A protein has these predicted regions:
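Active-site-adjacent beta-strand/loop module that shapes the phosphate/pyrophosphate-binding cleft
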Residues: 129-152
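The catalytic Nudix box helix
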Residues: 92-127, 141, 145
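N-terminal strand-loop-strand
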Residues: 33, 50-93, 97-98, 119-120, ...
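Short linker/helix segments within small regulatory modules
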Residues: 44-49
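Nudix hydrolase/Nudix homology domain
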Residues: 1-32, 87-91, 155-191
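Short functional micro-motifs and their immediate structural scaffolds
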Residues: 40-43, 61
Length: 191
C-alpha cells in the first residue's frame, strides 16, 4: 500500500488518479474470485463493473465507503489536525467514515465531536472526490463552530489539533487531495 501512495502526487493529476483507480480495481477483482453467498466461481459482467455468480445469481460490486472531510470554521480560523497513526505527518482536516443508518450531516457532527470534542452548525456540502487509496468517496463539508472552541483531543485518532488563522494555514504544494483544496479555499477567503 505504501508504494502506491507515490502515485497521488504524480503529474498530471489525471495520471495519478488513473493509476490509483486501476490499482483499486485490480485488487478488487483479485479478491472476488468466489461468490460470498454460495462459494461458486464468479465471472466478470460484460456490461457493468461487477462480478456475477451464474450459480445463485448473486452480484458483487466494488466496495466504496462514504467518508467526510470537514473544514470547521471559527471566524477567520480553521481547525486543522494531524493523525496519530500512519505515515501522513502533514496537517489535515477532521475526517471519518459514515456509519450505517447515519446521514452525512450526522457523520460530520459525530466525527468532529469524537475527534476534538466540539459542536458544529451550518453544515454546507462543498464537493466530492473519489479516493481509491482507501476505496472511499470523500465528501467535503464546511461548517461553523457552535459554542466553545476548547479542543478535547481524541489521542487514539489524532496527535494534535489546533486553530489556524487564515493567513497561517500550512499546506503541501504537491498534494492533490480534497483536503488540500478545502484548506486553500479557506485561506483565500472563499469558504
Amino acid at each position: 500500500m505504501e508504494d502506491i501512495i507515490i502515485f497521488r502526487n504524480l503529474g498530471p493529476q489525471v495520471n495519478g488518479f488513473a493509476l490509483i483507480t486501476g490499482y483499486q480495481l485490480h485488487n478488487w477483482y483479485e479478491s472476488r474470485k468466489f461468490c460470498g453467498k454460495c462459494g461458486h466461481p464468479l465471472v466478470p459482467d460484460a456490461r457493468e463493473r461487477m462480478m456475477y455468480c451464474p450459480h445463485c445469481k448473486n452480484t458483487e460490486y466494488p466496495k466504496i465507503s462514504p467518508a467526510v472531510i470537514v473544514g470547521v470554521r471559527n471566524g477567520n480560523r480553521l481547525l486543522m489536525s494531524k493523525y496519530a497513526g500512519g505515515t501522513a505527518r502533514r496537517y489535515a482536516l477532521i475526517a471519518g467514515f459514515a456509519e450505517i443508518g447515519e446521514s452525512l450531516e450526522e457523520t460530520v457532527k459525530r466525527e468532529v465531536m469524537e475527534e476534538v470534542g466540539l459542536k458544529v452548525k451550518n453544515i454546507e456540502y462543498y464537493k466530492s472526490q473519489p479516493w481509491s487509496l482507501s476505496s472511499s468517496l470523500l465528501m467535503g463539508f464546511y461548517c461553523d463552530l457552535e459554542g466553545s472552541d476548547q479542543i478535547v483531543l481524541e489521542e487514539d485518532e489524532l496527535s494534535e489539533a489546533q486553530w489556524f488563522e487564515r493567513e497561517e494555514i500550512p499546506y503541501d504544494d504537491y498534494d492533490v487531495s480534497l483536503t488540500r483544496e478545502m484548506m486553500i479555499r479557506f485561506k483565500k477567503g472563499l469558504a
